[in-house]
Regions:
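Rieske [2Fe-2S] iron-sulfur-binding subdomain
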Residues: 1-30, 63-167
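Glycine-rich active-site/cofactor-binding loop and its immediate structural neighborhood
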Residues: 9-58
Length: 167
């Protein structure tokens, strides 16, 4: 949640197979959407993060507010009667708890009860005090590898004596 301190801040996430756009609206609520324009399917936001008052598709310029509502179209007369209420961004259930943002990436799924779902971990999540943390750096590695092996290398010290004997 540290990435969305102010209204209009947003970030995109593409690692679930669903292009996700997460933003904070003017009412200080976290909102998540499928990051696809309802006109021709282009990505609405192409940057990994930023801040904007509105979200505009770079392809034909359809514009959405921070709640995902369609607010503007270029040359609207060429479209006839378009019901703007039915052409907003597809919203995804999003929750802000314990300094983290939780998003359900499938729009048709039943909304989970986040309090019940996180209850078994609530004490541990609270103790981490993530709300007070600041992101130092973010980067992505796009490698053809088994992520379990890479992660385990940072979690165990058994390999230190042989792999890092001179460091």
């Amino acid at each position: 949640a540290e990435q969305l301190k102010e209204a209009g801040q947003y970030f995109t996430h593409n690692d679930t197979g669903v292009p996700i756009l997460v933003t904070r609206n003017r009412a200080n609520e976290v909102k998540a959407f499928i990051n696809v324009c309802r006109h021709r399917g282009a990505r609405v936001v192409t940057e990994p993060c930023g801040k904007a008052n509105t979200l505009s598709c770079p392809y034909h310029g359809w514009t959405y507010d921070l709640n995902g509502n369609l607010r503007g179209m270029r040359q609207p007369a060429g479209f006839g009667a378009v019901d703007k209420n039915s052409h907003g961004l597809v919203e995804l259930p999003a929750f802000e708890r314990f300094g983290l943002i939780w998003v359900q990436p499938k729009p048709g799924d039943e909304k989970i009860d986040i309090q019940s779902w996180l209850a078994p971990m609530a004490e541990q999540l609270t103790s981490l005090n993530i709300e007070s943390h600041t992101m130092f750096r973010q980067w992505s590695l796009n490698l053809n590898m088994n992520w379990h092996i890479a992660l385990e290398g940072f979690l165990e010290t058994y390999h230190f004596c042989s792999a890092h004997k001179n460091t």
